[in-house]
Amino acid sequence: MSLAETFTKLAVTAAQAGISATGAAMKSAQSAIESAVEAVTGTPAPDTTQAPLDGPPDLDHALSDFANRAARIFYFMPPSASAVPAALESLANAVSASFRHVDLRNPANFTRLPLALGTMLTDAGSRALEGIDAIGAPRYAEFIRYAVQIFSEFPVYVTLEYRELIERQQRWLVDHPDDSITRKELGRAFVKTGRYAEAAEQLTRAAAGDVSIRSAALHEAGVAYYFCGSYSEAIAAECGALDADSENAPARFWLWLAAQRVGGYPFDVPEQHRMEIKTGWGETSLRYENIAERAGLDKTSGGRGIAVFDYDSDGWLDVAIACAHGGTSLYRNNRDGTFTDVSIESGIYHGVNGFGMAAGDYNNSGYPSLAICRMGFYGGLIELWRNNGDGTFTDVSAESGVSVWAAAFSCSWVDYDCDGRLDLFVCTNLGGLFDRKVQHKLFHNNGDGTFTDVAEKAGIISGWPAIGHAWGDYNNDGYPDLFLSNAVGRPQLFRNNGDGTFTEVTAEAGLDSPTLAFNAQFCDIDDDGWLDIIQYTWAIHEDVIYSMRNGEAPPYGHATRVFRNNRDGTFSLISSEIGITECWGSMSGNAADLNNDGYPDIVLGNGGPLVDRTEPMVVLQNDHGQFRNVTFSAGLPLTGKGHGINCADLFQDGRLIVLCATGGAYPGDLSTTAAFAPSERPGNYLAVSLEGTTSNRGAIGARLKLVAGGREQHRVVNGGSNFGCMPPQQHFGLGTLETVDSLEVWWPGGKIERFVNLPVNTKVVITEGSDSFH
């Protein structure tokens, strides 16, 4: 670390400490004032976990809402003094909308206002400083521009407000036809809403009118042409963008994409604009083909989470996909290599605008239900859809007590107290630059179909927004622990104390190094019987392109992080040691033995919210503990925005199908679900399905140890991580081995059972308490 970097880090740390202390003091004072006001008036603070019908319910959230609205107003305001009156009128309307349920003439609210403003600003400042620490000063300004863009634009484009925005820009250009910047923004708005031909026209005109934006405008025109299928025009536009600015890395990437569409790469591309790819060509025996259309899984949507589970309990795995711009999709396995879309008749289609989802049999009925996080950044109600056992689902969100309002990205089922009933955890983020952090939710299963949020009581308290999380028993004490993958900054590890409470042990575990990340999972990557942690990091597009061109991350980049469990309560970062050295925009990922050689591989679903942010999904093949990128060698050409990544033996033939739900944040950026199947079974295997009796029915949290050929393999039944959940059925690759020496099952309640003489190339079902399998 350079001297300048050292001083920057020290300054950031000191500022963080100061802001944290100031924020704590302000929050304490605010709490005291609120208690005093409640004592005088007899009116408690409003409940902020329920969805506001037509505006924020209290002063804190009203102030944050107004700050977010103001940021959007100034973000979209044309760069002209003549636009100021309209902006001021919009600000006045924003005050009315944000403070609809808050009477600022009330002395109590007036007294609270300065402290509410102070706590909002200290929260935002603390997050900003954490971002500098995580991202680094060289990339921070670019990241801030990115954050301002997505938080300003998402609320507009997820609603019909974008129509008003487009009309306002069009009216402005009638009177100001030479305003190339507004014309560029109009073209970008057309791209985001799927009006690609109009977008290309406006962006090309903007590029011709202002040399300062020529490269950026021509690049986005190239993206619009690409989506139109006009690949030659896309090539010309991206070449023009690079002529204007040879450092425009996204333009070089899209030129690479477009030229391949017409078979002209690299020779039809000027030499100075070519992009040599130095990664993804590692040696592998895997050869994939996309079977989504043939299997009936090729639905076009804004795909997010994927849950693979047996919803009708017929022994075959089915698929559910959460869609950001539509209803949830459910596909029934026909047992013949195809699926039938049963979304509407099952009722699950009404679970709209889903992001994260998880399947779990919370009432131990034998039929797993679905929990869905809705709307992500935009904020929505958590939903619980009970499986009725007859092919249909019923929304029981309100009556079960889980219907709370949050900007939630991921959820999971876990039996954290090992009482045989699945509990539900919901991980929350932010819905705007100035949003207040909503506490994560740990819903304890009361055993009567209802849940109680015990997160604060249990000690799971975090002031940081998180996108992903994972549960796993890292210290082998029989109780699942929680890892939070905080979006910007340090992750957090909460150790389960076994008494219903948790203790944060991040620093002492050696996990307090900051990064920018989406999701995570516990996985025994080295099969030593101790769970390791994979944290899927997210990089800006330029760093991804650098990795593609150089085969490694830039000096300031963050590769996928693998933390090895040291078996003493601590972890060590070993990514570079095991060959994981590239930056990707990983929004999802999973580990599974794709080539059946007995070693877990890693699949990354990559991309980003912006329309021009697309990149390949990545396969990192594990060769006896060393990983290599085999993406292109294996025939995985998919470029897009990979959210839910899942690996499952859908056809019970030993081939793990790689499922990828893709789609962007904007309504014009949809794509089609992919399902990549190996051309042939790569090796022998054993599939194991567990049924709990005293443990939860789906055996979530169970650990399995298989011994074959002189080595161990370890698996854990997961109740959800990333944007979705892996199947409860566990897959063991055996290579050329034809015998299994033994299989041990460690049930969540502590019982251990051992089985011998198991067959290969088949699925076995083990019921807790039984001395045999079938």
What annotation goes with each model-predicted range?
Residues 237, 626, 632-774:
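Gly/Ser/Thr/Pro-enriched helix-cap/hinge segments flanking short amphipathic alpha-helices
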